[in-house]
Amino acid sequence: MVRFLHMSDTHIGAKSLTIEEREQDYYDTFQEAVEIAIDEKVDFIIHSGDLFDTWIPGNRSMKVFRDAMMKLNDRQIPVFYVFGDHDRPRRNSESAAGIFDFLGLHILGRDEFAGIEREFSGMKVFIGGISNMKGYLRNQLKEEYKKAESASTGYKNSILISHQALDPIFIPEQCEAKVNDLPMNYSYIAMGHLHDFVEREIGPLLSYPGSTELKSDREINGLLKMGKGINVIDLDNGVASLHRVKLKKVRYQFKVESDPENYLEEIKSILDKYANAIGEKKPIVNLIINGQISMEEVYEDLKKINGAIFNRPQILKIVDMPNVPSGSSELREYFQAFLKDQKLTDLAMKVFQHTADGDKEAIIREAAGEAIDN
């Protein structure tokens, strides 16, 4: 039997413009995943893309990755990796991660499918990879999957690594390929790009392990339902079995949408509800308030809560509809009620008519004339 760890979308080096602690969060969860690999005594690691948050990572990101590779290399744990859409080198540039190939890093399929045969515990394993292909490379992707199918013929144990969004697992309009385009003669298909955990039996076992840390508040629901984690895969006689391991160093996030009267209580309520899951790190709260309240008042209120970090709150003010005389059907009366200015009402009527006529030049002339008058 062969055992390996599958992780993806670690986004090492990602930062927040407003919360300084976020950069360290991505390092923490990546390093935790590496420690899990060592504790599980895996034979190798699969990383299916977006290792770094950018194709030109900073020195601190490179140092974190170098230290991890040295630790893995000391234990003879190689890493097989494809590029995602974030860390794929531009044109003829070299890969940042590639300088650590001497520490056991194998980059597969930069511009086309590539595969490698390795032996672990006396068992031959074929590992193939295709880096992210979108834009002008999208039309090439199906052909690369066909190459992958041909290359793995004759291997009992095989793994395909790919960083793509697949229909119907993801939104069809944002996908580069369909599940049916994948080669079905692999034991395990290690996907990357989606940040939530997905496991599917499609013939072979397919999985997106998801990101190791949240990149946006769209991932909050997935975090609260399943957590963030990595996959430990046992591969034996062509059959892959998946064991999910949750990461403990993930910083929790919450989204609270409320009104000026109740937002503080709702924040306290959700923090109490998930108190046992949050862990040592203060969670981040993304607050949206619907109603009339000043930002200064909100900031003063939030100082009363010590157990969370807050992104800049959003205040969505409710705009009162103009009071139009009952039974009115005149557009001018609507403009007058809303603008409360005769001159602006005249301008609005003219711009409306020019818009209806499709006369862009007349609209520009009216606007320019108004600017000169003022």
Curated annotation (Swiss-Prot):
Assigned keywords, A-Z: DNA damage, DNA repair, Endonuclease, Exonuclease, Hydrolase, Manganese, Metal-binding, Nuclease
EC class name: hydrolase
Active site: H86 (proton donor)
Cofactor: Mn(2+)
CDD domains: MPP_Mre11_N
Sequence positions that bind Mn(2+) 1: D9, H11, D50, H195
InterPro entries: Calcineurin-like_PHP_ApaH, DNA_Repair-Maintenance_Comp, Metallo-depent_PP-like, Mre11_archaea-type, Mre11_N
Activity regulation (record text): Nuclease activity is regulated by Rad50.
GO biological processes: double-strand break repair
GO molecular function: 3'-5' exonuclease activity; DNA end binding; endonuclease activity; manganese ion binding; Y-form DNA binding
Cofactor binding, note field: Binds 2 manganese ions per subunit.
Residues annotated for Mn(2+) 2 binding in this entry: D50, D85, H163, H193
A Pfam family: Metallophos
EC number: 3.1.-.-
Complex formation: Homodimer. Forms a heterotetramer composed of two Mre11 subunits and two Rad50 subunits.
Family to which the UniProt record says this protein belongs: Belongs to the MRE11/RAD32 family.
Function: Part of the Rad50/Mre11 complex, which is involved in the early steps of DNA double-strand break (DSB) repair. The complex may facilitate opening of the processed DNA ends to aid in the recruitment of HerA and NurA. Mre11 binds to DSB ends and has both double-stranded 3'-5' exonuclease activity and single-stranded endonuclease activity.
PANTHER family referenced in this protein's UniProt entry, alphabetically: COMPONENT OF ATP-DEPENDENT DSDNA EXONUCLEASE, NUCLEASE SBCCD SUBUNIT D
Record protein name field: DNA double-strand break repair protein Mre11
Organism, as annotated: Thermoplasma volcanium (strain ATCC 51530 / DSM 4299 / JCM 9571 / NBRC 15438 / GSS1)
